[in-house]
Amino acid sequence: MTKGCFITVEGGEGAGKTSALDAIEEMLRENGLSVVRTREPGGIPIAEQIRSIILDVDHTRMDPRTEALLYAAARRQHLVEKVLPALEAGHVVLCDRFIDSSLAYQGYARGIGFEDILAINEFAIEGRYPDLTLLFRVDPDVGLSRIHRDQSREQNRLDQEALTFHQKVKEGYERIVETYPERVVEIDANQSFDQVVADAVRMIKQRLSL
């Protein structure tokens, strides 16, 4: 069976990734593709438990390196238990966040260092990078305003970080675009939701030749 395609969606808080993924998944299914939808951290029981530890609002004393290692551990288990089997079975895997989140959040915004976080995560993923990454670019103040207006959203520890932290996340993603131009495509998430989805769908169709 033909191997599948691994598509990840990245962006700062409030970029609208999760809502856009609903529309992207529907489009892919309408085109006759088998889709496995997942997220990081999470997607499987072990990783979901790690997620609850990482994002717990009461865990304010968590060391940045502890945080980075927990993300990498969740990523490894999620990759081998869910992502790789789905790809081998020929599915399109749509994942909300992957290695680039660690590079931007822990490597850049937390100040651990891009190269150190890259080393930790390359150990975890063993070279299995996404085939395509959609980076939803949104101004940090716009993104934070969105999440604070969303009454249905469960606030997590990252939501409580200062604006300066989220500005550093944005800078981290800018470096990622420069480092991996062959797989990372930028989407302007400051636009209307419909336009964001249209741009994302167009990019995916080009990559999958739909």
Curated annotation (Swiss-Prot):
ATP binds at residues 11-18. PANTHER family: THYMIDYLATE KINASE (PTHR10344), UMP-CMP KINASE 2, MITOCHONDRIAL (PTHR10344:SF4). GO terms for cellular component: cytosol. Transmembrane segments: none annotated. The gene is tmk. It comes from the Bacteria. Keywords: ATP-binding, Kinase, Nucleotide biosynthesis, Nucleotide-binding, Transferase. This is Thymidylate kinase. It catalyses: dTMP + ATP = dTDP + ADP. GO terms for biological process: dTDP biosynthetic process; dTTP biosynthetic process; dUDP biosynthetic process. It is an enzyme of class 2 (transferase). Phosphorylation of dTMP to form dTDP in both de novo and salvage pathways of dTTP synthesis. One of its GO terms (molecular function) is dTMP kinase activity. It comes from Halalkalibacterium halodurans (strain ATCC BAA-125 / DSM 18197 / FERM 7344 / JCM 9153 / C-125). Its EC number is 2.7.4.9. Belongs to the thymidylate kinase family. It holds the Pfam family Thymidylate_kin. NCBIfam families: DTMP_kinase (TIGR00041).
